[in-house]
């Protein structure tokens, strides 16, 4: 059996734990844009400098190795080939699966008001990269609106 989970948020990680508890032998691959696992609920703690990037993680450092999980990090899914049971990544790589779980969660919504979406200083807060961009921008900002 080949399992593929898209997303390494709380739902994806919990699914991986559950699969590994029931099936210790099968192939398990996780795919995400993220380069490290982090709690989205704790991103505000990063912005307030109460936690660093490592302290946002909710899994042990060796989680993927210990659970024999292949993690394709910093990867975006381009297309699902359902009939062929393959996930195509942006770089053209295809990952085969028998069972697929899409656990990507939501995305921030920036309303289509004027040029708001194109502004370099307007952010959503869903990913660590969002928090990092906000933190960097805040260093130079004179006024901040939340």
Question: Across the structure, where does each feature detected by a protein language model lie?
Answer:
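FAD-binding core/adjacent interface of flavoenzyme oxidoreductases
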Residues: 4, 61, 65-145
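Beta1-alpha1 glycine-rich phosphate/pyrophosphate-binding loop at the start
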Residues: 1-70
